[in-house]
């Protein structure tokens, strides 16, 4: 059994660690709120762009853009969004399980897969998992910019344009609330079929005069829209990372507190036993005299 000095040292060490985990919890909570604000700020941009795309498509029904037309699927690409750092509970593990499950279903249909990776954790995972990686982006920080992501997006779009990919998916974590993050797989290209009530299904009674031509404008807008979807996925993943880290650090702080209580109880019992023994020795010595 540990002596009193060893227990005191353990308690001091755990208290020091507890201060760190509590500080990390508070920092993660602050970063999560900022990431949520960026999520809210980015949505109107993507929504308005989708409305303009919908109007262009309806105004030019004879023009079928390649990013909006399904074709036989032989090869698919995945843009996988993970975090750069750990200490986020099972956030990345659950995401990779989702990817592996989806990839397995594709391979069972003899469909080849390729990847573009965002985040150091994804890079590390796919080194062991294998698969053809077309590009990787890491060290995005807590406030990633759209410019940092264009490389990973463009390499996949280039492969699609060349016919090397027939479909592109975005895999990231969805922010449900501060306690819950849900990995999800979304079809990026071709644009997923519009749901009822979606802007792509809406009929507009007005028209614009476009400069440049509508087809040329649609080409650029679709690329920007796809980039914005990936950006939103990355920003949402940052919010998920920080919320998962906040929860993990709170659990670590609480566990440290419980461990300190348990060690303090052991310390008190040992100290009580030592005092009792000393008293017994004194009484025994006095009786001998």
Swiss-Prot record:
Location in the cell: Cell inner membrane
> Which HAMAP family does this entry report, sorted A to Z?
ATP_synth_gamma_bact
> What do we know about how this protein assembles, alone or with others?
F-type ATPases have 2 components, CF(1) - the catalytic core - and CF(0) - the membrane proton channel. CF(1) has five subunits: alpha(3), beta(3), gamma(1), delta(1), epsilon(1). CF(0) has three main subunits: a, b and c.
Where is it chiefly localized? Answer: membrane
The way this protein sits in the membrane is described as:
Peripheral membrane protein
Instruction: Name the gene.
Output: atpG
Q: What is this protein called?
A: ATP synthase gamma chain
Pfam family of this protein, just one? Answer: ATP-synt
- A GO BP entry: proton motive force-driven plasma membrane ATP synthesis
One GO cellular component term noted in the UniProt record for this chain: plasma membrane
What are the alphabetically sorted keywords of the record?
A: ATP synthesis, Cell inner membrane, Cell membrane, CF(1), Hydrogen ion transport, Ion transport, Membrane, Transport
Does the record carry Ion transport as a key word? yes
Q: One GO molecular function term? A: proton-transporting ATP synthase activity, rotational mechanism
What's the source species for this entry?
Acinetobacter baylyi (strain ATCC 33305 / BD413 / ADP1)
Q: Which CDD domains match?
A: F1-ATPase_gamma (cd12151)
* Coiled coil region boundaries: none
- Respond yes or no to whether keyword Transport is given for this record: yes
**Purpose of the protein:** Produces ATP from ADP in the presence of a proton gradient across the membrane. The gamma chain is believed to be important in regulating ATPase activity and the flow of protons through the CF(0) complex.
Family note: Belongs to the ATPase gamma chain family.
């Amino acid at each position: 059994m540990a002596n009193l000095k060893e227990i005191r040292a353990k308690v001091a060490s755990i208290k020091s660690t507890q201060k760190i985990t509590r500080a990390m919890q508070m920092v993660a909570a602050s970063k999560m709120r900022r990431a949520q604000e960026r999520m809210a700020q980015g949505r109107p941009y993507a929504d308005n762009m989708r409305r303009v795309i919908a109007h262009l498509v309806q105004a030019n029904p004879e023009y079928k853009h390649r990013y909006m037309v399904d074709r036989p699927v032989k090869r698919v690409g995945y843009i996988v969004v993970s975090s750069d750092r750990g200490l986020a509970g099972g956030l990345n593990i659950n995401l990779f399980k989702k990817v592996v499950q989806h990839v397995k279903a594709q391979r069972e249909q003899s469909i080849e897969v390729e990847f573009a990776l965002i985040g150091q954790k994804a890079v590390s995972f796919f080194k062991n998992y294998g698969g053809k990686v077309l590009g990787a982006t890491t060290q995005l920080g807590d406030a990633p910019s759209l410019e940092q992501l264009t490389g990973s997006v463009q390499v996949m779009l280039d492969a699609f344009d060349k016919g090397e990919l027939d479909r592109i998916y975005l895999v990231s974590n969805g922010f449900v609330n501060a306690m819950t993050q849900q990995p999800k797989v979304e079809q990026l290209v071709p644009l997923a079929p519009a749901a009822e009530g979606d802007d792509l299904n809406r009929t507009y009674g007005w028209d614009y005069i476009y400069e440049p031509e509508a087809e040329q404008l649609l080409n650029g807008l679709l690329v920007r829209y796809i980039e914005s979807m990936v950006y939103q996925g990355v920003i949402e993943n940052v919010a998920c990372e920080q919320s998962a880290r906040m929860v993990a650090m709170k659990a670590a702080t609480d566990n440290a507190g419980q461990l300190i209580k348990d060690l303090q109880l052991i310390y008190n019992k040992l100290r009580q036993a030592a005092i009792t023994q000393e008293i017994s020795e004194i009484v025994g010595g006095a009786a001998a005299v």
